[in-house]
A protein has these predicted regions:
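Internal, helix-rich recognition cores of eukaryotic regulatory domains
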Residues: 1-207
């Protein structure tokens, strides 16, 4: 029996990494996918059928600058590509959200396609209100990256000064790394632990 509420203990557990066998259940709860599933049922079959009438487009990558799919096994990559096309066909108003493909790929590592779909759709719905998980336009994304640069400047001046001494722009580094959850630049278990907290607490954990 699933408990649809996010407890403090769940948040704490996520910070240390959710056990593999619990990720499917906790991601479904924390993303709001379970609640949406109880409200509208399994919408994957209808969404997939509708997407079959929509021409494939590069837009289905949601503006992703670094293609995480190249780091996945070919079979998984094809699965994610098809999944993203269906998702984009139902959310064509999103013009730029490069984090979405990475989140989709990570959800599909642990979830069946219908559950991953209802989970990420719930995350998109919540983000329309307050960008909790995703920025949904290019302007929102660039503003969040700029805010990250200002935060580093304020909270970690040594890091900021070191970056400047190397002629590096912290905001541009964030622009490159955030959409892929630092993959493939950190071990997958570490990235998954970060993702655990992201699903529960939103994109603020990336800063």
């Amino acid at each position: 029996q699933f408990d649809p509420n996010i407890s403090d203990s769940m948040k704490l557990q996520a910070r240390f990494g959710i056990p593999h066998k619990k990720r499917r259940q906790l991601w479904l709860i924390a993303s709001g996918g379970l609640k949406l599933l109880t409200q509208i049922g399994d919408v994957w079959p209808a969404s997939k059928k509708s997407a079959d009438t929509v021409m494939p487009s590069e837009n289905s990558k949601f503006g992703s600058a670094i293609d995480i799919l190249t780091f996945l096994p070919p079979a998984i990559s094809r699965k994610v590509n098809k999944f993203l096309h269906v998702l984009w066909s139902q959310n064509q108003e999103i013009d730029f959200s490069p984090l979405i493909p990475t989140v989709a790929a990570l959800l599909l590592l642990y979830m069946e396609v219908p559950l991953a779909y209802i989970s990420i759709q719930s995350m998109i719905n919540k983000s329309r209100q307050d960008s909790w998980y995703f920025t949904l336009t290019q302007d929102q994304f660039l503003a969040s990256v700029h805010a990250f640069g200002e935060l580093v400047e304020k909270k970690s001046q040594p890091v900021s000064h070191h970056a400047k001494s190397l002629n590096l722009n912290i905001a541009q580094i964030g622009l490159s790394l955030f959409p892929v959850f630092f993959l493939p630049f950190m071990p997958l278990p570490v990235a998954l632990t970060l993702f655990d907290s992201f699903v529960i607490e939103g994109r603020k954990v990336l800063y």
